[in-house]
Amino acid sequence: MKAMKATKKAMTKTGLAEALAPKPSSARRIAPPSSRAWPPSAQEVKKTGKLIIPGLVMVKTRKKPATKAGKREMFGKVVLVKAQPAKTVVKAYPVKALKDNF
C-alpha cells in the first residue's frame, strides 16, 4: 500500500482546537465533543490524507491497489478469488505518548 500524497498542509493544533470549539450557533443543542470532532476530522483526512490528534491517535489514508481475479493457493487448496477494485483505506494508530502510558 502506498501513502497518499498530501495535497495541502496538515491541520495544526490551533486549527484542531478551533474546529472542536463550540460554535455560537450550536448553543441550543448540547453535543458531546466526539460528535463535534467528527465532521472537521473527516474533512481533514480527505483533504490531506493525515490527521493527528495530539496525545491520542494518528489517522492516515493509504491507497490499496486493485487485485486481479484468479486462482490462489490457500492452505494447500486452490481458491477462486474475485477481482477487487482499488480503494483508499483509513487506518488509525496510537501515538507514542499514549503507548508510553500503558
Swiss-Prot record:
Residues 1-43 are annotated as: Disordered. Residues 1-11 have a biased composition (Basic residues). GO terms for molecular function: DNA binding. Its main location: nucleus. It comes from the Eukaryota. The keyword DNA-binding applies. Keywords: DNA-binding, Nucleus. It is found in: Nucleus. Residues 21-42 have a biased composition (Low complexity). GO terms for cellular component: nucleus. This is Major basic nuclear protein 2. It comes from Crypthecodinium cohnii (Dinoflagellate).
